[in-house]
Amino acid sequence: RLIERGVIEKYGDKNGCFRLIDSEAQNIDWFNSSINNIDIKYPFGIEHYVHTMPKNIIVVAGSPNAGKTAFMLNIVAMNMDKFKINYFSSEMAAMELRSRLQKFDFPISKWRFTAKERSHSFADVIKPEEINIIDFMELTEDFWKVGGMIRSVYDKLSTGIAIIALQKAHGATMARGGVGSLEKP
Protein backbone atom coordinates (compact mmCIF):
# COMPACT_ATOMS: atom_id res chain seq x y z
CA ARG A 1 0.00 0.00 0.00
CA LEU A 2 2.86 2.41 0.68
CA ILE A 3 4.08 1.88 -2.88
CA GLU A 4 0.63 2.69 -4.25
CA ARG A 5 0.49 5.88 -2.15
CA GLY A 6 3.93 6.95 -3.40
CA VAL A 7 5.58 6.80 0.04
CA ILE A 8 8.19 4.15 -0.80
CA GLU A 9 9.62 2.50 -3.89
CA LYS A 10 11.55 -0.68 -4.60
CA TYR A 11 15.28 -0.18 -4.17
CA GLY A 12 18.05 -2.32 -5.61
CA ASP A 13 17.87 -5.88 -6.87
CA LYS A 14 17.10 -7.66 -3.59
CA ASN A 15 13.58 -8.61 -2.60
CA GLY A 16 12.14 -6.59 0.26
CA CYS A 17 14.43 -3.57 -0.17
CA PHE A 18 12.66 -0.23 -0.34
CA ARG A 19 13.47 3.42 0.15
CA LEU A 20 11.39 6.37 1.31
CA ILE A 21 10.57 8.76 -1.51
CA ASP A 22 11.79 12.26 -0.67
CA SER A 23 9.48 14.54 -2.61
CA GLU A 24 10.66 17.77 -0.96
CA ALA A 25 12.92 20.23 -2.77
CA GLN A 26 13.95 23.66 -1.52
CA ASN A 27 12.83 26.60 -3.66
CA ILE A 28 15.57 28.75 -5.20
CA ASP A 29 14.54 32.39 -4.79
CA TRP A 30 16.52 33.62 -7.81
CA PHE A 31 14.25 36.65 -8.32
CA ASN A 32 15.02 38.28 -4.96
CA SER A 33 18.62 37.15 -4.85
CA SER A 34 21.45 39.63 -5.21
CA ILE A 35 24.70 38.76 -6.94
CA ASN A 36 27.41 38.85 -4.30
CA ASN A 37 30.81 37.61 -5.33
CA ILE A 38 33.15 36.69 -2.51
CA ASP A 39 36.11 39.05 -2.78
CA ILE A 40 38.70 36.33 -2.29
CA LYS A 41 42.22 36.61 -3.70
CA TYR A 42 44.04 33.70 -5.33
CA PRO A 43 47.65 33.17 -6.34
CA PHE A 44 48.44 34.28 -9.90
CA GLY A 45 45.50 36.72 -9.92
CA ILE A 46 43.03 33.93 -10.71
CA GLU A 47 40.24 36.06 -9.18
CA HIS A 48 40.40 38.25 -12.31
CA TYR A 49 39.21 35.29 -14.40
CA VAL A 50 36.66 33.61 -12.12
CA HIS A 51 33.94 34.81 -9.78
CA THR A 52 33.70 33.00 -6.46
CA MET A 53 30.16 32.85 -5.10
CA PRO A 54 28.76 31.58 -1.79
CA LYS A 55 28.63 27.76 -1.60
CA ASN A 56 31.24 27.39 -4.34
CA ILE A 57 33.59 24.43 -4.31
CA ILE A 58 37.02 25.09 -5.80
CA VAL A 59 39.11 22.02 -6.62
CA VAL A 60 42.89 22.25 -6.91
CA ALA A 61 44.34 19.08 -8.41
CA GLY A 62 48.01 18.28 -8.81
CA SER A 63 50.44 15.41 -8.73
CA PRO A 64 52.47 14.79 -5.56
CA ASN A 65 54.91 17.63 -4.77
CA ALA A 66 53.41 19.89 -7.45
CA GLY A 67 52.79 22.74 -5.00
CA LYS A 68 49.20 22.21 -3.86
CA THR A 69 50.02 22.99 -0.23
CA ALA A 70 52.01 26.09 -1.18
CA PHE A 71 49.06 27.24 -3.30
CA MET A 72 46.64 26.67 -0.40
CA LEU A 73 48.86 28.45 2.13
CA ASN A 74 49.17 31.39 -0.25
CA ILE A 75 45.36 31.60 -0.33
CA VAL A 76 45.41 31.75 3.47
CA ALA A 77 48.09 34.47 3.45
CA MET A 78 46.24 36.57 0.88
CA ASN A 79 42.85 36.40 2.65
CA MET A 80 43.38 35.88 6.39
CA ASP A 81 42.90 39.56 7.23
CA LYS A 82 39.50 39.62 5.53
CA PHE A 83 37.91 36.21 6.17
CA LYS A 84 37.73 33.49 8.81
CA ILE A 85 39.73 30.63 7.35
CA ASN A 86 39.76 26.99 8.44
CA TYR A 87 42.66 24.94 7.15
CA PHE A 88 42.23 21.16 7.37
CA SER A 89 45.50 19.31 6.79
CA SER A 90 45.69 15.59 6.20
CA GLU A 91 49.46 15.40 5.96
CA MET A 92 51.11 18.03 8.19
CA ALA A 93 51.49 18.17 11.94
CA ALA A 94 52.27 21.38 13.85
CA MET A 95 56.04 21.36 13.31
CA GLU A 96 55.86 20.99 9.53
CA LEU A 97 53.09 23.56 9.18
CA ARG A 98 55.07 26.10 11.22
CA SER A 99 58.15 25.40 9.10
CA ARG A 100 56.17 26.11 5.92
CA LEU A 101 54.60 29.28 7.33
CA GLN A 102 58.01 30.64 8.36
CA LYS A 103 59.05 30.68 4.69
CA PHE A 104 56.65 33.55 3.98
CA ASP A 105 57.85 37.17 4.01
CA PHE A 106 56.16 38.17 7.26
CA PRO A 107 56.44 37.17 10.92
CA ILE A 108 54.80 33.98 12.10
CA SER A 109 52.82 36.06 14.61
CA LYS A 110 50.89 37.71 11.76
CA TRP A 111 49.18 34.48 10.65
CA ARG A 112 45.43 34.49 11.40
CA PHE A 113 43.62 31.23 10.63
CA THR A 114 42.52 28.03 12.33
CA ALA A 115 44.51 24.92 11.46
CA LYS A 116 43.17 21.44 12.18
CA GLU A 117 44.51 17.98 11.50
CA ARG A 118 41.90 16.02 9.55
CA SER A 119 42.01 13.25 6.94
CA HIS A 120 38.40 12.05 6.66
CA SER A 121 34.73 13.05 6.94
CA PHE A 122 35.40 16.69 6.09
CA ALA A 123 31.72 17.56 5.83
CA ASP A 124 31.46 16.96 9.59
CA VAL A 125 33.87 19.82 10.38
CA ILE A 126 33.05 22.37 7.67
CA LYS A 127 32.21 25.87 8.93
CA PRO A 128 29.21 26.79 6.72
CA GLU A 129 29.83 30.55 6.59
CA GLU A 130 33.62 30.61 6.37
CA ILE A 131 36.43 29.71 4.00
CA ASN A 132 37.30 26.03 4.39
CA ILE A 133 40.55 24.76 2.90
CA ILE A 134 40.98 20.99 2.68
CA ASP A 135 44.61 20.07 2.05
CA PHE A 136 44.07 17.39 0.85
CA MET A 137 41.05 15.10 0.43
CA GLU A 138 42.65 11.67 0.57
CA LEU A 139 41.33 8.93 -1.70
CA THR A 140 43.00 5.63 -0.93
CA GLU A 141 40.39 3.37 -2.52
CA ASP A 142 37.06 3.67 -4.28
CA PHE A 143 38.19 6.81 -6.11
CA TRP A 144 34.76 7.07 -7.72
CA LYS A 145 33.35 8.13 -4.32
CA VAL A 146 35.04 11.55 -4.54
CA GLY A 147 31.95 13.15 -6.11
CA GLY A 148 29.86 12.13 -3.11
CA MET A 149 32.52 13.37 -0.69
CA ILE A 150 32.61 16.76 -2.41
CA ARG A 151 28.81 16.84 -2.48
CA SER A 152 28.70 16.29 1.29
CA VAL A 153 30.96 19.32 1.78
CA TYR A 154 28.78 21.39 -0.57
CA ASP A 155 25.64 20.45 1.35
CA LYS A 156 27.16 21.82 4.58
CA LEU A 157 28.01 25.25 3.11
CA SER A 158 25.70 28.27 3.38
CA THR A 159 27.56 31.50 2.55
CA GLY A 160 31.04 30.03 2.84
CA ILE A 161 33.19 28.18 0.33
CA ALA A 162 35.45 25.14 0.26
CA ILE A 163 38.76 24.89 -1.54
CA ILE A 164 39.71 21.24 -1.88
CA ALA A 165 43.09 19.85 -2.92
CA LEU A 166 43.04 16.48 -4.69
CA GLN A 167 45.90 14.24 -5.77
CA LYS A 168 46.46 13.57 -9.42
CA ALA A 169 48.64 10.86 -10.93
CA HIS A 170 51.71 12.08 -12.82
CA GLY A 171 50.67 12.84 -16.40
CA ALA A 172 46.94 12.52 -15.69
CA THR A 173 44.56 15.25 -16.85
CA MET A 174 42.12 14.78 -13.96
CA ALA A 175 42.36 14.21 -10.23
CA ARG A 176 41.79 10.85 -8.62
CA GLY A 177 38.12 10.13 -9.00
CA GLY A 178 38.16 11.26 -12.62
CA VAL A 179 35.04 13.03 -13.84
CA GLY A 180 33.51 12.62 -10.37
CA SER A 181 35.98 15.22 -9.10
CA LEU A 182 34.55 17.72 -11.59
CA GLU A 183 30.84 17.22 -10.96
CA LYS A 184 30.31 19.77 -8.16
CA PRO A 185 32.90 22.46 -8.89
Where do the language-model regions lie?
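Phosphate-binding/switch region of NTP-binding enzymes
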Residues: 147-185
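Conserved inter-motif catalytic segment of the P-loop NTP-binding fold
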Residues: 51, 63, 79-160
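The Walker A/P-loop phosphate-binding site
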Residues: 18-104
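Short gly/ser/thr-rich secondary-structure transition/capping motifs
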Residues: 39-44, 113-117, 171-172
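A short, conserved structural fragment
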Residues: 3-13
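Active-site-adjacent loop/helix micro-motif of nuclease/hydrolase catalytic cores
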Residues: 67-72, 141-148, 173-174
